[in-house]
């Protein structure tokens, strides 16, 4: 079967490896025929050659791990050892081993859920990041009537903007150095700010500080501090971005004096929140169509990741389709 792996910084190689088959499935696992994958911002450090912490990320120049780093997948069930999945089901969710960039993917069935047949696989793969956003928003206060600021307006940050506005946020501020003014109305952003977060927070008036600040950048330590500085007294800061460092410096005095709450965490209860994402998408039928801006074939994985690494105001979600 076909598979891809990163063999050097910024370089994918297509290979042929032995097929995954039903004999390889453990209890609770599902074998998928690849239909589509989504490129996530958290995939990009691996593409750049950074060494991660997953088993098998041990190549000399890059990970050299089959199928890595894709975790957002849609596919058709070939075989199942999970009670809720059957051959022929079309499902979306997580490639639980972060090896979704191959023709046949083995994943934990508890991280997959069916999607509406009206959606193309490339559109459906957007349900996975939407599920993550909905789960994170469950951890926040009721957003009705609040000012919500999101640092980072990439594919995940724009979803946070959309969900916050749909939840009744009074004002949504989106901060990104890439110009997102063209996408702001469709994603519920009242105040699109084209600036780095340090510049934005340095010029904030007290009345413009937010009731909820969501960090949706990750992979460095600075933006968490900016989120804390941008929070109004009594506010909640949610750190969603992936933490590549073990220790993050924060202004604890500011946390204390402003009575702030800092939260973070990965997505749990994944089948349930995939179901919530499907319901949300049904109620907002324009969302996934607007969200998906670029689709590449499996013969151009390199092109998909090259685009993902370039600042582009027209790019939101990139999918790779079979």
Predicted regions and their residues:
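NAD(P)H dinucleotide-binding glycine-rich loop of Rossmann-like/cofactor-binding domains
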Residues: 60-66, 70-72, 90-151
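Glycine-rich phosphate-binding loop and adjacent beta-alpha segment
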Residues: 220-283, 322
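Mid-domain Rossmann-like dinucleotide-binding core that forms the NAD(H)/NADP(H) cofactor-binding site
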Residues: 122-195
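N-terminal Rossmann-like NAD(P) cofactor-binding module of classical short-chain dehydrogenase/reductase
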Residues: 92, 213-214, 238
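C-terminal hydrophobic helical "lid"/dimerization subdomain
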Residues: 225, 271-322
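Short, well-ordered loop/turn sites that connect or cap secondary structure elements
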Residues: 84-85, 142, 231
């Amino acid at each position: 079967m076909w598979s891809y792996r990163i063999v050097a910084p910024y370089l994918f190689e297509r290979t042929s490896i032995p097929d995954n088959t039903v004999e390889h499935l453990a209890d609770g696992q599902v074998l998928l025929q690849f239909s589509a994958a989504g490129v996530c911002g958290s995939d990009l450090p691996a593409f750049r050659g950074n060494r991660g912490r997953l088993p098998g990320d041990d190549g000399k120049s890059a990970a050299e791990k089959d199928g890595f780093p894709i975790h957002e997948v849609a596919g058709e069930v070939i075989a199942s050892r999970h009670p809720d999945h059957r051959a022929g089901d079309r499902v979306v969710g997580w490639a639980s081993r972060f090896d979704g960039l191959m023709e046949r993917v083995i994943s934990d069935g508890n991280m997959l859920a069916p999607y509406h047949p009206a959606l193309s696989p490339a559109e459906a793969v957007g349900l996975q990041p939407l599920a993550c956003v909905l789960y994170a928003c469950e951890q926040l206060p009721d957003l009705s009537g609040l000012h919500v600021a999101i640092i980072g307006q990439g594919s995940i940050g724009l979803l946070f903007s959309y969900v916050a506005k749909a939840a009744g946020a009074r004002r949504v501020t989106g901060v990104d150095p890439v110009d997102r003014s063209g996408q702001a109305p469709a994603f519920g952003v009242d105040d699109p700010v084209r600036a780095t977060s340090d510049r934005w927070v340095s010029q904030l008036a007290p009345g413009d500080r937010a009731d909820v600040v969501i960090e949706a950048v990750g992979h460095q330590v600075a933006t968490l501090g900016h989120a804390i500085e941008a929070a109004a007294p009594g506010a909640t800061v949610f750190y969603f971005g992936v933490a590549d460092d073990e220790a993050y410096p924060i202004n604890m005095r500011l946390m204390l004096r402003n009575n702030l709450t800092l939260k973070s965490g990965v997505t749990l209860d994944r089948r349930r929140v995939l179901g919530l994402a499907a319901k949300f998408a049904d109620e907002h039928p324009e969302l996934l169509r607007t969200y998906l801006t670029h689709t590449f074939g499996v013969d151009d994985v390199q092109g998909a990741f090259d685009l993902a690494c370039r600042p582009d105001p027209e790019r939101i979600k990139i999918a790779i389709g079979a």
